[in-house]
């Protein structure tokens, strides 16, 4: 089943296979103007909700593989997770500025990223404290709104409007982080330590 909505192409696939992860140096660029004329994207408010009060955005396509990478303290890096063949679409991007790792310069730091099955979500485990790192989910290709969400909101488009990146807490709540939309079908939020991060919207 394929859904088309403007700039969004929604597809479903049950195939699984190897995914590709690419690591590259970040390249700075100017912010996209929002509807208010500001060069900085607007942010959603930070709030905490019971996990039972949100819908997590489902993901089709072949998911990225889990991966472990070695970061170097003092060096800026971008880690890109891609869906598997055939499309190799970007699934998520983790950005670590040169000052983000709280470790002596030159220290090797292990980072493990595991993709949560069937949804736009990752489990992050970094062996050093991070400050200023960010996570971006890119969902244009394999967006799948939960059926109940579409029934409530009337369309996948309406559900998408309220999406944010959240961090799952051990007490059964989700912290919806201040989330930006740097581009269409992209959500960006700060990484608040190790844990599970998902794209979700309130019920």
For every predicted segment, state its role.
Residues 73-107:
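Predominantly extracellular/luminal regions of secreted and cell-surface proteins
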Residues 26-28:
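C-terminal motif of bacterial Sec signal peptides marking the signal peptidase cleavage site
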Residues 122, 171-179:
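Surface-exposed loop/edge segments in extracytoplasmic proteins
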Residues 12-22:
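Sec-dependent N-terminal signal peptides
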Residues 1-13:
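N-terminal secretory signal peptides that target proteins for export/translocation
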Residues 187-203:
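C-terminal beta-strand-rich structural cap/linker in extracellular carbohydrate-active enzymes
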Residues 46-68, 75, 104-169:
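Proteolytic processing hotspots in large secreted/extracellular or virion-associated proteins
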């Amino acid at each position: 089943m394929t859904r088309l909505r403007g700039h969004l192409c929604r597809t479903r696939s049950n195939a699984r296979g190897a995914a590709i992860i690419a690591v590259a140096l970040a390249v700075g660029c100017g912010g996209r103007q929002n509807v208010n004329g500001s060069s900085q994207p607007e942010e959603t408010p930070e709030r905490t909700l019971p996990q039972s009060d949100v819908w997590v955005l489902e993901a089709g396509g072949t998911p990225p593989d889990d991966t472990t990478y070695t970061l170097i303290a003092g060096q800026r890096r971008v880690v890109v997770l891609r869906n598997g063949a055939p499309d190799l679409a970007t699934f998520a991007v983790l950005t670590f500025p040169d000052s983000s790792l709280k470790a002596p310069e030159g220290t090797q730091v292990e980072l493990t990223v595991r993709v949560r099955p069937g949804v736009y979500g990752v489990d992050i485990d970094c062996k050093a404290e991070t400050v200023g790192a960010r996570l971006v989910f890119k969902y244009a290709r394999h967006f799948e709104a939960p059926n109940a969400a579409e029934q409530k909101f009337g369309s996948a488009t309406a559900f998408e409007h309220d999406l944010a990146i959240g961090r799952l807490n051990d007490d059964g709540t989700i912290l919806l982080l201040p989330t930006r939309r740097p581009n269409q079908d992209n959500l960006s939020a700060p990484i608040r330590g190790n844990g599970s991060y998902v794209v979700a919207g309130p019920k």
